[in-house]
Regions:
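Hydrophobic, Leu/Ile/Phe/Ala-enriched alpha-helical segments that form helix-helix packing faces
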Residues: 18-25, 86-90
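Short amphipathic alpha-helical segments that mediate assembly, nucleic-acid/protein binding
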Residues: 14-15, 79-82, 106
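Charged, low-complexity surface segments at secondary-structure and domain boundaries
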Residues: 1-8, 66-72
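Acidic, low-complexity, intrinsically disordered interaction modules
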Residues: 43-90
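Mixed-charge, Lys/Arg-enriched low-complexity segments
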Residues: 83-116
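Negatively charged, low-complexity tracts enriched in Asp/Glu with abundant Ser/Thr
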Residues: 3-23
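Short coil/turn linker and secondary-structure boundary residues
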Residues: 2, 10-13, 77, 91-93
């Protein structure tokens, strides 16, 4: 397995970073969003807590791309940049899931999984 962690300070730079690391032979299998609206973006550089994960395969090789500075469920640039990445990856999603807190659980997390 290969882990690629994108830790950009501004969410709008994440799509450029994602484009830079992706390869044409990667097949997207799943996207997971796990964003804590009560805490926000994790301050520590702990990739396992990054709110965005895209899981690709190249043959039998699993590639997990994690992105730190993307947000969901509130106004601002983060959700718009998250939507741009989902569009770039060809993910079908409900815009309300990204731009509103309708999917927010009692623990404050918005958890979304998209299978490809």
């Amino acid at each position: 397995m290969i882990n690629i962690n994108i830790f950009e300070a501004a969410s709008y730079t994440n799509i450029s970073a994602l484009k830079a690391v992706m390869h044409d032979n990667w097949i997207l299998k799943e996207v997971r969003i796990d964003y804590n609206t009560l805490i926000g973006i994790p301050l520590e550089n702990m990739p396992e807590k990054f709110p965005f994960k895209a899981i690709f395969y190249s043959g039998d090789l699993k590639i997990e791309v994690r992105i730190c500075s993307l947000t969901a469920g509130y106004p601002g640039t983060g959700p718009h940049d998250l939507a741009k990445i989902l569009d770039f990856l060809g993910i079908q999603y409900d815009k309300e899931d990204i731009f509103t807190q309708k999917k927010r659980g009692e623990d404050g997390f918005i958890r979304l999984t998209y299978k490809c």
